[in-house]
């Protein structure tokens, strides 16, 4: 598959470990390569390169918004940096 978003995700150098992604249900699910544990979910939002960033909520048992006041919508590059540095994404890994 030649999905440019998946290629960008898999090329991203994350200090916590390599990521791989798959396209699922109108978005992308990111996994840690070492454990295959889910790390984050990116859902397209608005302009071509904007994504809502979601994390797996152990309390709600579903993907949830990361922002304190609602959705976090950023470019793919900003989303990957956000995921790399925020601990909430790495709880299950």
What kind of region is each of these model predictions?
Residues 1-9, 55-93:
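Mixed-charge, Lys/Arg-enriched low-complexity segments
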Residues 1-35:
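Negatively charged, low-complexity tracts enriched in Asp/Glu with abundant Ser/Thr
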Residues 17-19, 26, 49-51, 85-88:
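Generic structural motif recognizing short loop/turn segments at the entrances and edges of beta-strands
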Residues 32-55:
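Short, conserved beta-strand/beta-arch hydrophobic-aromatic motifs that form part
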Residues 18, 28, 47, 68-71:
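Intrinsically disordered, low-complexity regions
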